[in-house]
C-alpha cells in the first residue's frame, strides 16, 4: 500500500505515518492540498493530513479540501500529543528569522514574543520543512519551531524545549481512504463525522438539525461551520458524533429524520480513534 502524508520526513504527520504504517510505502508531499490530491488522482491508497489542533482549532485547508474537492472517507483518526521546540544549527546561533508551519507558530506565539520579539516569523508548509531549511542554510541567522524527531533527523541543536504556550497540546490527524481501517495501536473510541448543508427555507434549521441527535441522547462532540463558497452567509456544518454500541443503533434513524427535514447529509467517515505517544 502507498500512503501519502504531509512531509518532509520529520513532520508530525510523518511521525504518525511511521507509527501506523511500519511496513508500507510512505510518500511525503509538500502541502496538504498535494496530499489529498494525490489520493484523488489514485497516486496512493491512503492520505494522512492534520485536521485539528487543541490550541489553534481546525486546519481549515484540510477540511475544505475534503469537503469541496474529494470523495475520500475518514477511515481512521490519530491523536498525537505535540511538543514544540526551537531548533538551530548551533546554540550560539544568532536568531533573526524563525521558520515554521502557521499552526506551530500560533501554538508558540507567547514564547516567541517574549524571547524573540524582533525576530521575523517566516511561514513554511510544515515544521519539518522549516527544520530542513534551517539545516540547509547554516549561515542564515535562523531557527525553526519543530519536534524532537526533526531535530535528530536534521542534526539541529535545541535552543529551547517544550515552548508551546499551553500544556496538553495535541493534534488530530485523519487518514483518508475508502473503508474503515484498524491498527495495532491504543484505540480510545469510535466516531462518526457528518457534513450537513441546511435548507434555505427551514426556520430554525440548525436547531432542528441538532435536535435529532439531542432527543436521542447521541453525544455530539463537535460542531463547526465552514463557508459553502456559494454566497456570503452560506455554510456547511461539520459534526462529530460518539459512535458507541448504543449510538450506532440510533444514528441511522437520526440521519433519516435529517433527510425528512430537507437537510443534505454527507457521511465523511465512520472510524476508530487511536492515541499515540508524545513526540
Curated annotation (Swiss-Prot):
* Pathway listed: Amino-acid biosynthesis; L-phenylalanine biosynthesis; phenylpyruvate from prephenate: step 1/1
List, for all copies, the residue spans of the domain called ACT.
194-272
Q: Which UniProt keywords apply?
A: Amino-acid biosynthesis, Aromatic amino acid biosynthesis, Lyase, Phenylalanine biosynthesis
Query: What Gene Ontology cellular component terms go with this record?
Result: cytoplasm
Q: Which CDD domains does the entry mention?
A: ACT_CM-PDT
Q: Which GO terms describe its molecular function?
A: prephenate dehydratase activity
- Substrates-to-products reaction catalysed: prephenate + H(+) = 3-phenylpyruvate + CO2 + H2O
Residues annotated as site: Essential for activity: 171
Q: What region holds the Prephenate dehydratase domain? A: 2-178
Q: What is its EC number?
A: 4.2.1.51
Q: Which GO terms describe its biological process?
A: L-phenylalanine biosynthetic process
User: Per the UniProt record, which residue ranges are transmembrane?
Assistant: none
Write down what this protein is called.
Prephenate dehydratase
Organism from which the protein derives: Lactococcus lactis subsp. cremoris (strain MG1363)
The gene coding this protein: pheA
Amino acid at each position: 500500500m502507498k500512503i501519502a502524508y504531509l512531509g518532509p520526513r520529520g513532520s508530525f504527520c510523518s511521525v504518525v505515518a511511521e507509527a501506523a504504517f511500519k511496513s508500507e510505502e510512505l510518500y511525503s508531499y509538500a502541502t496538504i492540498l498535494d496530499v489529498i490530491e494525490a489520493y484523488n488522482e489514485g497516486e496512493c491508497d491512503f492520505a494522512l493530513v492534520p485536521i485539528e489542533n487543541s490550541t489553534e482549532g481546525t486546519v481549515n485547508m484540510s477540511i475544505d479540501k475534503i469537503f469541496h474537492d474529494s470523495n475520500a472517507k475518514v477511515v481512521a483518526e490519530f491523536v498525537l500529543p505535540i511538543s514544540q521546540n526551537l531548533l538551530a544549527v548551533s546554540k550560539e546561533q544568532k536568531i533573526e528569522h524563525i521558520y515554521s508551519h502557521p499552526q506551530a507558530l500560533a501554538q508558540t506565539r507567547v514564547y516567541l514574543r517574549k524571547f524573540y520579539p524582533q525576530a521575523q516569523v517566516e511561514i513554511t508548509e510544515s515544521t519539518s520543512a522549516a527544520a530542513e531549511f534551517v539545516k540547509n542554510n547554516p549561515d542564515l541567522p535562523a531557527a525553526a519551531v519543530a519536534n524532537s524527531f526533526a531535530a535528530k533527523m536534521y542534526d539541529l541543536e535545541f535552543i529551547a524545549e517544550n515552548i508551546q504556550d499551553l500544556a496538553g497540546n495535541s493534534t488530530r490527524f485523519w487518514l483518508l481512504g475508502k473503508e474503515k481501517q484498524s491498527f495495532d495501536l491504543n484505540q480510545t473510541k469510535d466516531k462518526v463525522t457528518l457534513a450537513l448543508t441546511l435548507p434555505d427555507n427551514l426556520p430554525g434549521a440548525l436547531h432542528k438539525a441538532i435536535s435529532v441527535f439531542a432527543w436521542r441522547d447521541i453525544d455530539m462532540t463537535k460542531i463547526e461551520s465552514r463557508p459553502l463558497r456559494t454566497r456570503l452567509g452560506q455554510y456547511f456544518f461539520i459534526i462529530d458524533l460518539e459512535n458507541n454500541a448504543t449510538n450506532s443503533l440510533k444514528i441511522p434513524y437520526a440521519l433519516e429524520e435529517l433527510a425528512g427535514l430537507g437537510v443534505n447529509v454527507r457521511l465523511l467517515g465512520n472510524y476508530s480513534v487511536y492515541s499515540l505517544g508524545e513526540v
